[in-house]
Structure formats: C-alpha cells, structure tokens
C-alpha cells in the first residue's frame, strides 16, 4: 500500500495539481466490527514524511481485519501461479491488539 505526500512536486497548474505516491506512510480507517471507536494509531514527523511512533505493516493490518471477520489469516490461502499464497505474506504477520475494542 502507499499513501500520498502532503506536498506537490513541480509547478502547480490547473492540470498539474496532484500529489506523489508516498510509500512510507498511509492512512486508513475502519468502523464497527469490534474496532475501537475514535482511536488513532501511529504518528508521523512534523512533515508527515517518516513514521515516528507505532508503525504498522499492511500485512499486520490485513491480519487484524481478517481476525475481526473470524478468519485465521495463517490458514486463508489462494492459489497464484501454482503456489498457495496468503494475504498476509509469509513473514509472520501479527494482529494489532491496540486496534481492537
């Protein structure tokens, strides 16, 4: 996953006003499903460029979402190019307990 930078690169015009991809930080929100209401997790520096507190890997977020749906992320697989793959990768994704009510 990726977020968007808070700044625009290049000259701003009517046709060029987008922001670049930002691979270090991204924002998402979830509602219901046993997640904490009004909870903010993680923090970036003053320039919203680097993570300074509680980083989360997308695989950990996926593991948490799957758990809240009653699905064991380590057992859920799909076939791709002849191999069983997991949405949470093979590197030991973990549920983020701070997000769960």
Task: Please describe what each predicted stretch is.
Residues 2-101:
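Ligand-binding pockets and gating/stacking loops
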